[in-house]
Amino acid sequence: MLAFCRSSLKSKKYFIILLALAAIAGLGTHAAWSSNGLPRIDNKTLARLAQQHPVVVLFRHAERCDRSTNQCLSDKTGITVKGTQDARELGNAFSADIPDFNLYSSNTVRTIQSATWFSAGKKLTVDKRFLQCGNEIYSAIKDLQRKAPDKNIVIFTHNHCLTYIAKDKRDATFKPDYLDGLVMHVEKGKVYLDGEFVNH
């Protein structure tokens, strides 16, 4: 595990911080590392990270209406009623530890609805850059961070974006379920993947 961290994290200071947080997480009931090799970051660990620097959390949208037998909220391209409940539950837990953040989503009905139910009234900014994912997603994240360098950022996006980031940054195979997330941060103009967000 130590060798993996040393090869993945270029900042000595951040390496020490993440090791300490992983050790703290390991004392709990959940493993500190996911089976895909990504560190597991729960709400409390995320709050500690946010004390060190602003965090960027990317979530996959909630349950899609067009791929479920559950009742749709409204538009068939949006999310289900169950999806709204799951997003609200996640948002309540998240906001209890990270109350201050800027909120973004891609320009699809399902991500907009997910972000709206997650935030319970927080201002949402729709940004089409979070629909198509490749290296350009890092430029978009850095752009948001430059505009508000001291703010945490939450982005609702899509499974292919999260899969791309995990593979590109840590060579990890990540197949996110609805509302699964990744935790990142920007340091000295570079975007780093810290781990997988787990809502426990």
From Swiss-Prot:
Keywords per UniProt: Hydrolase, Periplasm, Signal
This protein's pathway: Bacterial outer membrane biogenesis; lipopolysaccharide metabolism
EC number of the protein: 3.1.3.-
Residues spanning the signal sequence: 1-25
Enzyme class label: hydrolase
GO cellular component terms given for this protein: periplasmic space
GO BP of this protein: lipopolysaccharide metabolic process
Organism superkingdom: Bacteria
Cystine connections: none
Cited InterPro entries: His_Pase_superF_clade-1, His_PPase_superfam, LipoPS_heptP_Pase
CDD domains per UniProt: HP (cd07040)
Compartments (UniProt record): Periplasm
Protein's UniProt keywords contain Hydrolase: yes
Family annotation (Pfam families): His_Phos_1 (PF00300)
A molecular-function term among this protein's GO annotations: phosphatase activity
NCBIfam families: PRK15416.1 (NF011945)
Function: Catalyzes the dephosphorylation of heptose(II) of the outer membrane lipopolysaccharide core.
Family: Belongs to the phosphoglycerate mutase family. Ais subfamily.
Name listed for the protein in its UniProt record: Lipopolysaccharide core heptose(II)-phosphate phosphatase
Species whose genome carries this gene: Escherichia coli O6:K15:H31 (strain 536 / UPEC)
Gene: ais
